[in-house]
């Protein structure tokens, strides 16, 4: 199937990624670990832009940028240099931002995503290094704020800005690109996406192959999808009414789900770029071979290996490699002798499904425990041991607990305030599989109490059988094996 794109939608993204796994800022020795710090405590004369200070380049930031470029299959520049981007804004104490202009460190890369009609390649125009500005805290909403506070803790944190080609044709494709891109960055261990402000996106969008509009500074993948859905609808409505779409910059109000005009093309600033005189150009071709050797197995390669090595489905492999910590957790479970296909089902379908239902995000894996935190409330967090998942899967595989009981154990482990093993939870909740005579008794009672459903099933209504199985599971408090109960009911009613 070929995706027709009837509305002529073109989407390109500019993604600002904090290299927040680095310990120090881009041009000074201040810590990048500022998220729980008091405002303006992770600063120094350099990142505050005080007169007489000179920047000192963080070599590890350059190495991280090269890693990102290699992972994106991009061209790494033989020589690169920094420029000054001149503009006045309160979050930029120097009056200019140190960035890269016409000599980016990476160009001509690509990311392959699942598009509307199969695999789809999104081109990477460039990726360049720069420093993050400070953070403005608006008192109240951004439109009605009567005052602004400035926190310079973020000022100078290393950034990579990645610019894509306008190759995405729907908001869904844009979100899939961001999910894939974030996954690659986390595999490289240069980026923690769970931290506030770690990834900020500017989205450029046009319809009917027309005028481009930029939506600035969107902070989440879901927000990007929502902003694009609204903006595409707005532009189509303008054209439908006989108007023309203006080339402008807009802001996305996430609370209201709308985009609002910030400035038109005529108001756009000239940044007067010129070469940063305090930093020499860099020749980095000699760094590339050694950095290439440090690249980890990336998501697509790991996914292919999981399918071949463990014999699991492509769908399970995609889910399990969507987070490197989840992939490592799964491999730890398999390494302890668990059937990889059963482990994939319980990890990708049940465990990950329960995390998503609770709005929990995987945050860590130390080789023993996988940790997770609430997406909106970092104070809500917990962890599960790989050894506990192994124990649970083995109990299920040995037929000692039903699938429903196993799900109940996972839910309890996710919600529990104190750590307990699966066996302890099963014992406390009475979840060990019911004895055969108990199941037989429950089936007999169910048949006797539900004559209408019995007659419906005998008459050919298949869903009535599901109802009867549910009643048996209810009577046995989920300890019966649903498949066995189903077979016994059929045998009883149809011989």
UniProtKB/Swiss-Prot annotation:
Q: Which GO terms describe its molecular function?
A: asparaginyl-tRNA synthase (glutamine-hydrolyzing) activity; ATP binding; glutaminyl-tRNA synthase (glutamine-hydrolyzing) activity
Task: Please indicate if the UniProt record lists Hydrolase as a keyword.
Answer: no
A single GO BP term for this record reads:
glutaminyl-tRNAGln biosynthesis via transamidation
Reaction catalysis annotation: L-glutamyl-tRNA(Gln) + L-glutamine + ATP + H2O = L-glutaminyl-tRNA(Gln) + L-glutamate + ADP + phosphate + H(+); L-aspartyl-tRNA(Asn) + L-glutamine + ATP + H2O = L-asparaginyl-tRNA(Asn) + L-glutamate + ADP + phosphate + 2 H(+)
Instruction: Name the Enzyme Commission number(s) assigned to this protein.
Output: 6.3.5.-
Which InterPro entries does this one have?
A: Asn/Gln-tRNA_amidoTrfase_suB/E, Asn/Gln-tRNA_Trfase_suB/E_cat, Asn/Gln_amidotransferase, Asn/Gln_tRNA_amidoTrase-B-like, GatB, GatB_C_1, GatB_Yqey_C_2, Gln-tRNA_amidoTrfase_suB_CS
Keywords tagged on the record:
ATP-binding, Ligase, Nucleotide-binding, Protein biosynthesis
Q: What does it do?
A: Allows the formation of correctly charged Asn-tRNA(Asn) or Gln-tRNA(Gln) through the transamidation of misacylated Asp-tRNA(Asn) or Glu-tRNA(Gln) in organisms which lack either or both of asparaginyl-tRNA or glutaminyl-tRNA synthetases. The reaction takes place in the presence of glutamine and ATP through an activated phospho-Asp-tRNA(Asn) or phospho-Glu-tRNA(Gln).
Note the PANTHER family from the entry.
GLUTAMYL-TRNA GLN AMIDOTRANSFERASE SUBUNIT B MITOCHONDRIAL AND PROKARYOTIC PET112-RELATED, GLUTAMYL-TRNA(GLN) AMIDOTRANSFERASE SUBUNIT B, MITOCHONDRIAL
What is stated as this protein's family in its record? Answer: Belongs to the GatB/GatE family. GatB subfamily.
Quaternary data: Heterotrimer of A, B and C subunits.
Q: What is this protein called?
A: Aspartyl/glutamyl-tRNA(Asn/Gln) amidotransferase subunit B
Q: What is the lineage of its organism?
A: Archaea, Methanobacteriati, Methanobacteriota, Stenosarchaea group, Methanomicrobia
């Amino acid at each position: 199937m070929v995706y027709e794109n009837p509305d002529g939608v073109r989407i390109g993204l500019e993604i600002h990624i904090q290299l927040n796994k680095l310990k120090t800022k881009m041009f000074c020795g201040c810590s990048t670990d500022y998220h729980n710090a008091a405002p303006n405590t992770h600063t120094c004369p350099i990142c505050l832009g005080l007169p007489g200070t000179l920047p000192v380049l963080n070599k590890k930031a350059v190495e991280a940028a090269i890693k990102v470029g290699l992972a994106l299959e991009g061209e790494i520049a033989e020589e690169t240099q920094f420029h000054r981007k001149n503009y006045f804004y309160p979050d930029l104490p120097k009056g200019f931002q140190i960035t890269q202009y016409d000599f980016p460190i990476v160009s001509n890369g690509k990311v392959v995503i699942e598009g509307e009609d199969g695999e789809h390649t999104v081109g990477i125009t460039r990726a360049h290094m720069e420093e993050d500005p400070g953070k403005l805290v608006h008192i109240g909403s951004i439109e009605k704020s009567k005052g602004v506070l400035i926190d310079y803790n973020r000022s100078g944190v290393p950034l990579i800005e990645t610019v894509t080609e306008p190759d995405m044709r729907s908001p869904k494709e844009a979100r899939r690109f961001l999910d894939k891109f974030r996954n690659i960055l986390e595999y490289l261990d240069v980026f923690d996406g769970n931290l506030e402000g770690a990834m900020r996106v500017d989205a450029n969008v046009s319809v009917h192959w027309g005028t481009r509009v930029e939506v600035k500074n969107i902070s989440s993948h879901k927000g990007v999808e929502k902003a694009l859905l609204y903006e595409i609808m707005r532009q189509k409505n303008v054209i439908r009414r006989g108007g023309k779409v203006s080339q402008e910059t807009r802001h996305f109000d996430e609370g209201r789900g709308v985009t609002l005009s910030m400035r038109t093309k005529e108001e756009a600033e000239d940044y007067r770029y010129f070469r940063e005189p305090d930093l020499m150009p860099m020749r980095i071709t000699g760094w590339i071979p050694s950095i290439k050797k440090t690249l980890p197995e990336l998501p697509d390669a790991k996914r292919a290996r999981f399918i071949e090595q463990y014999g699991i489905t492509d769908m399970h492999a995609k889910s399990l490699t969507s987070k490197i910590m989840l992939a490592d957790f799964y491999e730890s479970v398999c390494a302890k002798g668990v059937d990889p296909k059963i482990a994939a089902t319980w990890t990708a379908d049940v465990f990950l499904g329960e995390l998503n239902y609770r709005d929990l995000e995987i945050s860590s894996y130390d080789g023993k425990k996988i940790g997770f935190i609430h997406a909106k409330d970092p104070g809500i967090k917990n962890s599960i041991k790989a050894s506990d998942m192994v124990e649970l899967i083995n109990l299920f595989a040995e037929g000692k607990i039903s699938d429903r009981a196993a799900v109940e154990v996972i839910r309890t482990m996710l919600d529990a305030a104190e750590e307990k093993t699966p066996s302890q939870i099963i014992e406390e909740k009475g979840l060990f599989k019911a004895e055969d005579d108990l199941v037989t008794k429950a089936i007999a009672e169910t048949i006797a109490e539900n004559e209408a459903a019995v007659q419906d099933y005998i008459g050919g209504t298949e869903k009535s059988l599901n109802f009867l199985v549910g009643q048996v599971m209810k009577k046995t408090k989920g300890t019966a094996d649903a498949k066995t109960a189903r077979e016994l009911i059929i045998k009883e009613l149809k011989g």
